[in-house]
Regions:
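Conserved alpha/beta cores of soluble small-molecule-handling proteins
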Residues: 1-136
Length: 137
C-alpha cells in the first residue's frame, strides 16, 4: 500500500475487543494506539524501500508478574518491519510445493476465535510437519 496502513483502525478495534475479553486495560484509547502506530510508521519511513510496505504489529501483554493476577502495569508496544517481497518472487514464477498439515489451530472450546492473540506455536508445529513431509517427498 506504498507506506500507507491498511485498515489499521479496524485492526486496532479488533485488538481492543480482544483485550476487553481477556480483561487487560492497555491504558491507551483506541485512538491513542492508532496515533502511536502512525507515528512509529512515520519515524521508520526511511527504512521502507521505494514501493515497499511495512508489517505493523501492535501488542499488549498483562505486564510483568509471576501470574496474570499479579501482573501489571501492562506492556504496550508497536513495531514495524519492512516486508521483503523479493522472497516471494520465485513463487510467482516457479510455483511452490504446498503441504496440508494435520496440525490444526486452537479449538474454539479452548480459545474464542474472536480473540486476537500472538500464540503461534501451532503455526510452528505445522511448519515443522510440512518440512518433514517435503523431505520425505
Amino acid at each position: 500500500f506504498n507506506g500507507k496502513s491498511y485498515r489499521m483502525k479496524e485492526h486496532i478495534d479488533r485488538l481492543y475487543r480482544s483485550l476487553k475479553y481477556v480483561r487487560i486495560d492497555p491504558g491507551l484509547s483506541n485512538e491513542e494506539m492508532l496515533e502511536i502506530s502512525e507515528e512509529v510508521i512515520r519515524h521508520n519511513e526511511h527504512l521502507r524501500p521505494s514501493g515497499g510496505d511495512f508489517n505493523i504489529r501492535q501488542f499488549v501483554t498483562c505486564g510483568p508478574g509471576r501470574s496474570t493476577k499479579e501482573a501489571g502495569p501492562p506492556t504496550v508496544g508497536v513495531t514495524v518491519a519492512p516486508i521483503d517481497f523479493s522472497r516471494y518472487a520465485a513463487f510467482y514464477d516457479d510455483g511452490v510445493h504446498a503441504v496440508i498439515a494435520r496440525t490444526r489451530s486452537y479449538s474454539s472450546d479452548a480459545l474464542d476465535p474472536k480473540v486476537k492473540h500472538h500464540s503461534r506455536n501451532n503455526f510452528a508445529m505445522a511448519d515443522l510437519e510440512a518440512a518433514r513431509e517435503a523431505e520425505d517427498g
